[in-house]
Amino acid sequence: MFKIVCGKSARLGVWLLAMVSLAFAQPPRRFRGGSPRMDSIQVADPKSDLDLASFSPDRFTFVRVVYDSQGGPGEAYYPGDGEWRPRWATDHPDGAKNLTWRLNQLTTIRANQGSLLLRLTDPQLQDFPFIFMSDPGWQVLSEAEQKALRQYLSNGGFLWVDDFWGEAEWKNLEDNMRQVAPSWTWFNITADHPIMSIVYPLSECPQIPALQLYRRGGETYDPPWIHKQPNGGIPDVSKVNFRGLHDERGRLVAVATHNTDIADGWEREGDDEEFFQRFSVKAYALAINILTYAMSN
């Protein structure tokens, strides 16, 4: 079991100050392009950005799940960074690249730089204790993927699902997980759960919007019209839901950060100083709590 350099409780403030002072001491940034062409739909095929030259099996590896989604433009894939991107690739690659860089910089967690992209049916998945799934509002899982995910979680693996908004997108995840394990139950993670204070004391899961949408209106939630319909309107997306999934033994096998985009806090940390100070610091604190819990329980 690894330890974190910074201590608990009051020492969170020291860490926050360190984060602010290091706001622009970052890995290289990549250029972000404009909107993709609407008359020629070509979906990008993102690749793993793991630094294989320095990869070590003894280090933490951020594994992002590759999956299929239903629908067309704006559904199965969306415009971003000048191209059409599949839902599973939301916040990739900079999200995990920055998170693993910060883990190495600020904690004693030794992490491989970048992320590894795997499908649920890839045999390699069983070699890693943690997997991350983004933007699953339109996700579809095959029977083989359902079986593989249940096997992974039953064998001690841990899943984090992030960045999906509104009741319709929650229901899609809930329905998929019901196919994975019908008897497993979701519950609300409250401030007294150990995951909220295992390293840094947090009173709640922060709500983090996509940076480009935050710049438009200053709200902490994404506007409901950009997500899966019907979504119930603004009240449906303005409240964060931080939920956990228990297996039949009562073990926490998955967490879901719903109505928030935690990974955007990592991805966009160097794009806007106000966004960094208001959102990125909290995004890293929650991530370290979740990863510490996942790796030690």
Predicted feature locations:
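Bacterial N-terminal signal peptides that target proteins for export
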Residues: 2-16
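Surface-exposed patches in mature extracellular/periplasmic domains of secreted proteins
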Residues: 109-119, 161-166, 184-192
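Aromatic-Pro/Gly-enriched surface loop or interdomain linker
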Residues: 26-130, 136-137, 261-297
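Short, well-ordered loop/turn elements at secondary-structure boundaries
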Residues: 126-127, 154-155, 248-250
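Hydrophobic h-region of N-terminal signal peptides that target proteins for export
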Residues: 17-25
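An acidic, glycine-rich "communication" segment
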Residues: 32-37, 42-43, 70, 76-77, ...
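Short alpha-beta junction capping motif
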Residues: 62, 130-170
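Stable alpha-helical elements in mature extracytoplasmic
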Residues: 95, 99, 145-148, 169-177, ...
